[in-house]
């Protein structure tokens, strides 16, 4: 399994002071990526990325995701450019709609979420390329804004989206699509069709988040996953047993990663549940990448 990147999520419920050591250990175990989360009231995504990047030497760090309504495109581009210059080639920036209820809660719910996301991604990418941006859109206005220190290596900007129109938007304006937990190989085929409808080419990145639980007792694995698959099944509008997970013993979990890779995933980011997430990561990496591979 040489073509797919294997990453790990630093879960939002884990305290921020634990991030540096977790990132260093994930890197030492051989993970390709570490992804941080930005949900209202939890940890900041850009600051979390900075912490993880500063604690490691090789690990690529993703932000999954910065909610467009909470972020000025100019300020977001400034922050991303700073990270990309200091840590070239090691950043992926995810931008999404944000949870509607949370955006209402803080008074930033847009009139048109689709317009805001498209205008934000388009302007952030242009600013990161060093362009002077003039935009009078439905949701975003930028009057001749230009970064003084754009990155020499522009980081990918990916859209964290779920619904069909948003997936088409991602194919039209983003470098890739970030796919939420619970989506399996058959979903990836549909997602690829929708991003392709928006204009995505073969280089459009597909990053998949997946709930993961590695253990030798199948009943215990199922019990550990249950509250997560139940909640996500309700969110996705599908039966719980159709919520895809990377789970089972280490070889079985590695097979789950292979299935996603065969369906087009470029990166699989494991969101471990249960005890000892780094031990689980070590086990699945050992099965996915045996020494003889």
Per-region residue spans from a language model:
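Active-site-adjacent structural elements that line small-molecule/cofactor binding pockets in enzymes
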Residues: 1-293
């Amino acid at each position: 399994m040489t073509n797919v990147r294997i990453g790990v999520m630093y879960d939002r419920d884990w305290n921020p002071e634990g991030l540096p050591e977790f990132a260093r250990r994930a890197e030492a175990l051989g993970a390709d990526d570490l992804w941080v989360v930005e949900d209202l009231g939890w940890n900041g995504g850009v600051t979390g990325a900075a912490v993880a990047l500063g604690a490691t030497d090789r690990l690529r760090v993703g932000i999954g995701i910065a909610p467009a309504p909470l972020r000025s495109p100019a300020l977001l581009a400034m922050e991303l450019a700073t990270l990309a210059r200091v840590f070239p080639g090691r950043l992926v920036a995810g931008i999404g709609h944000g949870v509607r209820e949370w955006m209402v809660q803080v008074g930033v719910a847009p009139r048109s979420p689709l317009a805001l996301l498209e205008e934000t991604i388009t302007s952030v990418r242009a600013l990161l390329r060093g362009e002077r941006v003039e935009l009078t859109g439905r949701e975003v206005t930028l009057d001749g804004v230009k970064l003084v220190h754009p990155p020499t290596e522009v980081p990918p900007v990916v859209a964290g989206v779920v619904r069909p129109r948003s997936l088409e938007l991602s194919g039209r304006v983003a470098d890739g699509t970030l796919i939420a937990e619970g989506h399996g190989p058959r979903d990836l085929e549909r997602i690829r069709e929708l991003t392709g409808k928006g204009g995505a080419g073969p280089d459009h990145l597909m990053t998949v988040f997946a709930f993961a639980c590695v253990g030798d007792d199948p009943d215990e694995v199922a019990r550990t996953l249950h509250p997560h698959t139940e909640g996500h099944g309700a969110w996705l509008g599908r039966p719980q047993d159709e919520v895809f997970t990377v789970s089972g013993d280490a070889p079985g979990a590695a097979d789950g990663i292979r299935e996603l890779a065969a369906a087009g995933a470029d990166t699989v980011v494991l969101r471990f549940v249960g005890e000892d997430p780094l031990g689980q990561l070590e086990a699945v990496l050992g099965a996915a990448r045996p020494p003889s591979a």
